[in-house]
A protein has these predicted regions:
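A cross-family phosphate/adenosyl-ligand binding-site feature
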Residues: 2-128, 133-365
């Protein structure tokens, strides 16, 4: 089974109001606009006057193929009241970057430009991606405003820790475009066909300690589990992702509950706890079949030319888990792929199994 690099089709034909405010991070809105447009969304950019000092409307218009609105006094060919027309057309509003000033305006209901008027007039969900100096972000007034906006249903993404415009390191850096896009997809998926369902997904590969330094592990990337968690979330499900170690760095899916484990036993306990009340368990993790019979508490010295380690079976998480839910398993095989997958399907009494040919260079293992 192969993973596609294409964005989820859920953004196709959706109208996204992309609000851009006066921050040095405003130039990054171009990347967000590009990703949304490539995913099939109709992107309507609304800029504050100060935002136009950091990035030109022409840049964003060229990316989206749509005119950019930045003034309360611009007439449209349809002669609509612009902020009302935009507000009614929106499936989601995303303000990136969101300054401390715009958040203060939204809290108090001040509507003195096209962007704030549009936000007040819309019934669409609103995503805010704050960006500012760390001291401004941590100011009690800003934190109070953020808390009020969250309480009103605004979805906040970031800010992250990193190098700021001042040259200092701190929290206040605009979230990455991929993270903002992921959050928008999460918000749009709330009313999907899996709304009200709980889906538990496992990912990554477990590690069984030999001593404090060494372990038995595998090459699982975790990509499949993370992609499945994102897909279930995009369709409205509540998702719990139990992740072991991944061989590559992966972006945590926005809006997904993350539980980190390392060993097969930890995986078993986490699954047993989280799966209560679940509608589906998708076991995409590569759980070790064997573990050292007894792990050394101190580092094993290389005093002998040979080292023999006695191994014991680990618990079979998928076979032993109990509950009335759909069970999906994975069979990572290098030979007799279909036969081995069918055997596992029957022996573990699964509802569905995915056969994964790990010899394929495009394998999603």
């Amino acid at each position: 089974m192969r993973l596609s690099n294409k964005e989820s089709k859920m953004l196709a034909d959706k109208t996204v109001i992309l609000g851009v405010t006066g921050s040095i991070a405003a130039y990054k809105a171009a990347d967000v606009a590009s990703k949304l447009t490539q995913a099939g969304a109709r992107v309507e950019v609304v800029m504050t006057e100060s935002a136009t000092r950091f990035i030109t409307p022409l840049t964003l218009s060229s990316i989206t193929g749509r005119p950019v609105v930045s003034s309360m006094w611009e007439l449209t060919s349809e002669f609509n009241i612009e902020h009302v027309a935009l507000a009614e057309a929106a499936d989601v509003v995303a303000i990136t970057p969101a300054t401390a000033n715009i958040m203060a305006h939204l809290v108090t209901g001040i509507a003195d430009d096209m962007l704030t008027c549009t936000v007040l007039a819309t019934k669409a969900p609103i995503v805010l991606a704050p960006a500012m100096d760390e001291n401004m972000f941590k100011n009690p007034v800003t934190q109070e405003n953020l808390a009020k906006l969250k309480a009103r249903g605004f979805v906040i993404v970031g800010p992250s820790y990193g190098r700021l415009a001042s040259g200092k390191m701190g929290q206040g850096r605009l979230a990455e475009a991929s993270q903002i896009l992921d959050t928008i997809k999460q918000v749009l998926g709330r009313s999907g066909d899996l709304a009200g369902r709980l889906v538990v997904v496992t990912a990554g590969g477990t590690r069984e300690p030999i001593d404090p330094v060494r372990y038995i592990g595998n090459r699982s990337s975790g990509k499949m589990g993370y992609a499945l968690a994102s897909a279930a979330r995009d369709r409205g499900a509540e998702v719990k992702l139990i992740t072991a170690v991944t061989s590559v760095t992966l972006l945590e899916p926005s809006g997904v509950g993350i539980i980190r484990v390392e060993t097969a036993l930890q995986m078993k306990k986490a699954v047993a706890k989280v799966v209560k009340g679940a509608d589906a368990l998708i076991m995409a993790a590569a759980v070790a079949d064997y573990q050292p019979q007894s792990a050394s508490k101190v580092k094993i010295k290389k005093e002998s030319p040979r080292l023999t380690i006695e191994l014991a079976r680990t618990p079979d998480v998928l076979a032993e888990v109990k509950g009335n839910f759909v069970k999906v398993g994975f069979a990572a095989e290098s030979e007799d792929i279909m036969a081995n997958a069918q055997k596992k399907l029957k022996e573990k009494r699964l509802d569905l199994i995915v056969a994964n040919d790990i010899t394929d260079k495009n394998s999603s293992f």
